[in-house]
Amino acid sequence: MMKFRFRRQGADPQREKLKQELFAFNKTVEHGFPNQPSALAFDPELRIMAIGTRSGAVKIYGAPGVEFTGLHRDAATVTQMHFLTGQGRLLSLLDDSSLHLWEIVHHNGCAHLEEALSFQLPSRPGFDGASAPLSLTRVTVVLLVAASDIAALGTEGSSVFFLDVTTLTLLEGQTLAPGEVLRSVPDDYRCGKALGPVESLQGHLRDPTKILIGYSRGLLVIWNQASQCVDHIFLGNQQLESLCWGRDSSTVVSSHSDGSYAVWSVDAGSFPTLQPTVATTPYGPFPCKAINKILWRNCESGGHFIIFSGGMPRASYGDRHCVSVLRAETLVTLDFTSRIIDFFTVHSTRPEDEFDDPQALAVLLEEELVVLDLQTPGWPAVPAPYLAPLHSSAITCSAHVASVPAKLWARIVSAGEQQSPQPVSSALSWPITGGRNLAQEPSQRGLLLTGHEDGTVRFWDASGVALRPLYKLSTAGLFQTDCEHADSLAQAAEDDWPPFRKVGCFDPYSDDPRLGVQKVALCKYTAQMVVAGTAGQVLVLELSDVPVEQAVSVAIIDLLQDREGFTWKGHERLSPRTGPLPWPAGFQPRVLVQCLPPAAVTAVTLHTEWSLVAFGTSHGFGLFDYQRKSPVLARCTLHPNDSLAMEGPLSRVKSLKKSLRQSFRRIRKSRVSGKKRAANASSKLQEANAQLAEQACPHDVEMTPVQRRIEPRSADDSLSGVVRCLYFADTFLRDGAHHGPTMWAGTNSGSVFAYALEVPAAAVGGEKRPEQAVEAVLGKEVQLMHRAPVVAIAVLDGRGRPLPEPYEASRDLAQAPDMQGGHAVLIASEEQFKVFTLPKVSAKTKFKLTAHEGCRVRKVALATFASVACEDYAETCLACLTNLGDVHVFSVPGLRPQVHYSCIRKEDISGIASCVFTRHGQGFYLISPSEFERFSLSARNITEPLCSLDINWPRDATQASYRIRESPKLSQANGTPSILLAPQSLDGSPDPAHSMGPDTPEPPEAALSPMSIDSATSADTTLDTTGDVTVEDVKDFLGSSEESEKNLRNLAEDEAHACAILIK
């Protein structure tokens, strides 16, 4: 009979079809700023911008929501990019001197980016392929000749090659060799020296046949491509960095390595030109750094703009990253906090226009993109609708809030608009507006909250493709730090010369690492939130539309409860400011709760309907009533051997003494493992469990090699008292007839504490509850036998659905939970998921995820998956991410595996740690310090770029035949989006679900019938726990007096045998 129990049932076609309608894995879009940018391009006709990166990625941006992404086959650095103006084509140059042609093509009404052709410059004539010096043919600069499909390639060997862009083939007979240029140079200038590499190629605005060529030695040449001759020569002597034509083409501007720039007059009467008309060193006379790039733009109102990067005094400000903007007598030195990659101006490019009249200056930095309005006095920055630097301060935590009410959304946006730090606001709209966003307006608004190292919390609009900044909350003003001193120094520096002006928001330095935000929780119905930090600070805030000046109440909770033998060796707590403090419109602090010891907060949860906030650290957890501003509960979870928990966050290395002690313990344990131990009640119970396991798993049934037993962990493991999760629920804890508020806490050692709360009920129709004190009584204490850290806890109602959020049911925003049937609690540990019935806490279902060696649960969330085939059908499932980077989806409460996907590379530890799931089957994780990858597990709820671009060039069959491949998405470099469906029959029949009405804001959850772990339908579970019998120690502190006496009597006889539950 046991053989039939382990036989796998066949897949149910109906269920497999339903799973395909519910689940689908897609990596959809990358939010944030590209990591390690290396090149920049702009198409003034289509108004689109391209950014290349060191990893070989190409990203094109237009209007908000218009994005295209491509990835070169070789992970080489993109050094230059150039648009074929108005054609939707882009030419990229890599550091291996290969050229690649990209095209924006349309399929089914939407556009995407494809690589069409690639080209490698052949070896220098006269050399064979093996002996040719690579430096001679290394491409240093690329120019796309206007009004033609020709590209000029400048090389390190001083040659200029010409290329047919449509086919990426060399044009024979048109190569400009250095010898031909040297014949036009006076003998005294040559002096037997080479010209040097080609540093710059610039096209003539009105005459495309004329090309300005600059060599590194300083020689400037105007080459006429039509007549194949030199039109003009400028005999420069300074090492050249960059070139620029004047608008009327009568002047040429050059910048040099000594921090100077020169203006040359193109006078046909003087050949060659020996001296420039103007030569100046803006920040001289002392030695200066090179001016890497210079732009000259004239204005109809008179005068001209001179914009250049670099040129700072080498000794004083050689480490600054600056772009200088000079017009008439006005000079502004834009001081950035990261390296300058490139910049361009948005100006008129029509040949018939007489003036440039620049509107904006776009500067691409290593860590952000800054756009300045050149038409408004003061040249203020233009707010960016995307490409905001997520990592302006290092991201320390993140959270997602789905279905934000419109009223709260408007209040947050209004508060953010009042935060403009600039004295003058820009009247210029975002200048990069190309393409059309075809995606529908999102029906629901989503907020992404990111906590940062500098104590700020940033609010992002995550409803669509473009991640737009909305509001920034700063908590540093509540505490005494050294920032005032730094601000005074910065103010003093601004009065000096050069006239520095701080631009951009990237600031990687934090005034105090204790300000770092560790946990964030927001109630979208009451506009209240909690922010918890690195030094044990827990801040409760409330949204206000007007600025106020008020003092903040401070409460201190000692989690150790004066326990002896523990001494905190970490950092001190932050000192709060006293007295009334000014607070701008936005989230304003209501009360500050300080945990002692001041360790980093590891878990937090907020229940606004009860006005309670719970928080946990590595020492214990606390409960605080922020309405009465009084503590309710403090519980220490430290084990006597948890000495490492007192070291603080900076002491992560075990001491040599402790490491040696544990090593000798392991050696002794291995030597005596074969000896017979003294029999006691606990060992007898374990032996009985082992016998049951052997009986349940006959020897003729072969176990899968990757499966293993879950080994129980030692109770004295370091940091076993860390609180991993906290949870509020209105459920049955005392008995099956009376439900009430409860609080649940899970720790690193597999302990779960459940408290019954006495919360005064609010009056009918009232928002606030009475002022009576809240009481907390320990109801249950569950110790998981395998002692794996508890990652998440959730209570399921009688229909198997998770309980709604605070105020959702009372305000008719979600269906009320079923309080008639039996509730259950889902406890997710790092090794397995278990469902217990309430209030008896007896085993109902479980799933052992660690049957795969080395697999651990890292992130868990309950999500709603709507069907693409039927709008009225949805299921609530459990989504989890493992340390291997795999995402698994399970049914609830049956814990049946539905699908699993490979999402993140297992080596990407930071990406796995940063993952956040949404309530509707999507997720975010960091692929770099500045970028979130967005993915979707839902077949219906997908956020991806859907856009088009109006292109003005014909697409004939010849050009289409050159297309070699579609570019892979950059996101695939960080995990293969393969889809693996569970092969076995999972639920027999589709799970029932109630309908989704149009007036229901939140999608409904599936009402799944509870399954017993011994039922016949559970026999097809692939990763069953048979043979891995564990015992949970459950202590009930709310039973009847007779049961309590019995428990105490049993506890006195044998503590390990008390209230034991056997789970098979």
Curated annotation (Swiss-Prot):
Keyword set, alphabetical order: Cell projection, Cytoplasm, Cytoskeleton, Endosome, Exocytosis, Golgi apparatus, Membrane, Phosphoprotein, Repeat, WD repeat
Cellular compartments annotated: Early endosome membrane; Golgi apparatus, trans-Golgi network membrane; Golgi apparatus membrane; Cell projection, Axon
Organ and tissue specificity: Expressed in brain, kidney, and muscle but is barely seen in heart and placenta. Down-regulated or lost in all cell lines and in most of the tumor samples analyzed. Loss was associated with advanced stage of the disease.
Organism the protein comes from: Homo sapiens
Gene Ontology CC terms, in alphabetical order: adherens junction; axon; cortical actin cytoskeleton; cytoplasm; cytoskeleton; early endosome membrane; Golgi cis cisterna; Golgi membrane
PANTHER family in the record: LETHAL 2 GIANT LARVAE PROTEIN, LETHAL(2) GIANT LARVAE PROTEIN HOMOLOG 1
Additional free-text comment from the UniProt record: Down-regulation of LLGL1 is associated with the progression of colorectal cancer and melanoma. Located within the Smith-Magenis syndrome region on chromosome 17; deleted in patients with this syndrome.
Region (Disordered): 966-1010
Phosphothreonine modifications at: T958
Family according to the record: Belongs to the WD repeat L(2)GL family.
Modified residues (Phosphoserine): S663, S967, S985
WD repeats: 38-71, 78-119, 139-176, 200-234, 240-272, 290-332, 340-374, 396-474, 518-593, 602-663, 723-783, 792-844, 849-902, 916-939
GO terms of biological process kind: axonogenesis; cortical actin cytoskeleton organization; establishment of spindle orientation; establishment or maintenance of epithelial cell apical/basal polarity; exocytosis; Golgi to plasma membrane transport; protein-containing complex assembly; regulation of establishment or maintenance of cell polarity
Protein origin, superkingdom: Eukaryota
Identification of the protein by name: Lethal(2) giant larvae protein homolog 1
Subunit structure: Associated with nonmuscle myosin II heavy chain. Interacts with PRKCI/aPKC, PARD6B/Par-6 and PARD6A. Interacts with STX4A. Interacts with RAB10 (GDP-bound form); the interaction is direct and promotes RAB10 association with membranes and activation through competition with the Rab inhibitor GDI1. Interacts with DCAF1.
Post-translational modification note: Phosphorylated at least at Ser-663 by PRKCI.
MF annotations from Gene Ontology: GTPase activator activity; myosin II binding; protein kinase binding; structural molecule activity
InterPro entries: Lethal2_giant (IPR000664), LLGL2 (IPR013577), WD40/YVTN_repeat-like_dom_sf (IPR015943), WD40_repeat_dom_sf (IPR036322), WD40_rpt (IPR001680)
Principal subcellular localisation of the protein: membrane
Described function: Cortical cytoskeleton protein found in a complex involved in maintaining cell polarity and epithelial integrity. Involved in the regulation of mitotic spindle orientation, proliferation, differentiation and tissue organization of neuroepithelial cells. Involved in axonogenesis through RAB10 activation thereby regulating vesicular membrane trafficking toward the axonal plasma membrane.
